[in-house]
Amino acid sequence: MATVKIPPVLRAAVGGEKQLSASGASVGEVLRSVAESHPDTHTQLFASDGGLNRYVNVYLNDEDVRVLDGLDTSVGESDTLVILPAMAGGAP
């Protein structure tokens, strides 16, 4: 199973865990596995069309999956996924 590192903003949705193990042959399958096990993460990770929410960045072994094959990027048993929500804000 791949390791999925959970950012602080999502930890309440996964019982406070900092990382999880999840199975899947692709990034999409691994993230869907996380969402099936922890339903509160689904709307935080996925848009209504099934793609990643635009403000969620996912890295596979330090490579942005968007420059790889996106949700179709292959994942191996010893790989690590990092979920990193984009931050925005500031004074108007």
Question: What kind of region is each of these model predictions?
Answer:
Residues M1-P92:
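Ubiquitin-like/PB1-type beta-grasp interaction modules and other compact soluble beta-rich domains
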